[in-house]
Curated annotation (Swiss-Prot):
The active site is at K83 (schiff-base intermediate with substrate). It comes from Herpetosiphon aurantiacus (strain ATCC 23779 / DSM 785 / 114-95). Transaldolase is important for the balance of metabolites in the pentose-phosphate pathway. The keyword Transcription does not apply. This is Probable transaldolase. GO terms for molecular function: aldehyde-lyase activity; transaldolase activity. Belongs to the transaldolase family. Type 3B subfamily. Disulfide bonds: none annotated. It is an enzyme of class 2 (transferase).
Length: 221
């Protein structure tokens, strides 16, 4: 499963990419506002740091305007993926953008039927939102499994991108459910790395190492 960072914080992306495990980045208008910088400048910096897919979202509500905005975004860098909300006008736009060779990520998906429609329109990625479903008492992982199964049934090439991830369990469950991608906040990526027994083991090894006779010189050059 690929790991994307869901952030517009350039420093977080830099740190994540340096770890060697980040395959892409997703942004949205809310994350852009939180960054507090010119959106174009932020995206151009992100695509320099991360060579993988970088989702940048349109904000128009009519198909022709979504397409216009998508074309502008796609010109910024070859790894830009145009992010479009799931709605009738959005599907029209995705169809057109796909016909022009522009990759798309259909977002704000909360049902398997929505994901199927997005895939039919030609979406490169579909983004079902887990955390927001959990917030209203629904099981987002059932949605992931349903979408993955439908796509397998019909050999649909659209990738399932699990979004609205709140904690490491969401990541693990997404992987078990067959999601192609999980996009997460940087803090969740950090939580995936940490385990108290790992920390304790490192501490013990370092203490024991001091008892090795040549510990102070073995790695000297």
């Amino acid at each position: 499963m690929k790991i994307f960072l869901d952030t517009a914080d350039v420093e977080e992306i830099r740190q994540g990419v340096a770890m060697g495990v980040v395959d892409g980045v997703t942004t949205n208008p809310s994350l852009a506002a939180k960054a507090g910088r010119n959106f174009r400048d932020v995206v151009l910096e992100i695509v320099e740091i991360c060579p993988g897919p970088v989702s940048a979202e349109t904000v128009a509500l009519q198909a022709d305007e979504i397409v216009r905005e998508g074309r502008i975004l796609a010109k910024w860098a070859p790894n830009i993926v145009v992010k479009v909300p799931l709605m009738a006008e959005g599907l029209k736009a995705v169809k057109q953008l796909t016909s022009e060779g522009i990759k798309t990520n259909v977002t704000l998906i909360f049902s398997a039927s929505q994901a199927l429609l997005a895939a039919k329109a030609g979406a490169t990625f579909v983004s079902p939102f887990l955390g927001r479903l959990d917030d209203i008492g629904q099981d987002g992982m059932i949605l992931i499994r349903d979408i993955v199964q439908i796509f397998k049934n019909y050999n649909i090439q659209t990738e399932v991108l699990a979004a609205s991830i709140r904690h490491p369990v969401h990541v693990l469950q997404s992987a078990l459910a067959g999601s192609h991608v999980a996009t997460m906040p940087f803090k969740v990526l950090q939580q995936l790395v940490k385990h108290p027994l790992t920390d304790k083991g490192i501490e013990t090894f370092l203490v024991d190492w001091q008892q090795v006779p040549d510990a102070a010189t073995v790695f000297a050059e």
